[in-house]
Amino acid sequence: MPTYQDISRHTSNVILDPEISSEIWAKAIDESAFMQLANRITIPGSGVKVQTITGEPTANWVDETNSKPVSFHSFGNKTITPYKLAVIEPFSDEFRRDKAALYAECVRRLPAAIAKKFDSTIMSNSAPGSGFDVLGTGVSSIAIGGSDVYGAFVSADAAISTADGIMNGIALAPQGKSLVLGAVDNSGHPLFTAGVGSNTVGNILGANVTVAKGIYVSGTPAIVGVAGDFTGVRWGMVESIKMAISDQATLTYNDGSDHTLNLWQMNMFAVKVECEVTFAVMDKGQLVLLTNAVPTTTTTGA
């Protein structure tokens, strides 16, 4: 048996299925929380410098015949730069022929790998380069792991409003969704579910809620979500997501040791999914990280 990490009919835990027709493409937008909540912009491959509004003019009352007040917007600028995100997965020719449905599902899920990496990078403190914003630094946090989950979201809403924002979006990791679904009132009724027969989270304080795996950040405490005013949040893509299939390329990879895989020689082919994307936040004060910590209670003496 070969030692390289290809997917063939002999791959562990793969069950042969009858060949069926299946769609092989699903957009990464459907899998990414930030692609759903933020506003999309189209940018050139070299990036773009966008104008930002940092202050608003102020109106005032005026007595009859008096001079009218003069006030101005204040402006700034922000550089947004895209970076390439890609994944390649090799398959044997026999795998595509004998397990068409499973192959189709693997290809369909490749864009989801792009989406998960995009979200997890944004939630980290390590950007792929300058001009790409991440939330691991410069963003405050609110603990929602206690018994008063509703109160925690009110606190998040207050923090966002203090930064002159309106909470209109919440991205939850599956672990955060579980905390939210477990929130009940004094009668034991769920607070945020769309219904007792539903496994989804309804709007929270009027904010749209989306759930994605890439939001979770392990740690003590773990980050299980982010809430904020997404009006000033942008994600950009150069052109669109691209997918290509090749049976002529030579692949190199490392899984602890170096490997070279000649697709033509091995009767294999590979599927490549790639895109150039970026992420920008105009005001990090209008975003709040949600953790699974239990809020501390401060007591005062008599």
Would you name each region that the model predicts?
Residues 62-68, 105, 185-187, 221-225, ...:
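Short, polar loop/linker segments at the starts of domains and inter-domain junctions
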Residues 58-61, 99-100, 179-182, 189, ...:
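Short helix/loop capping segments that flank catalytic or ligand/cofactor-binding pockets
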Residues 56-58, 86, 95, 116, ...:
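Short loop/turn segments at secondary-structure transitions that flank enzyme active sites
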Residues 76-79, 86-165, 187, 210, ...:
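Alpha-helical scaffold segments that mediate packing/assembly in large oligomeric complexes
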Residues 44, 140-269, 275, 299-302:
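Extended oligomerization regions of viral-like shell subunits
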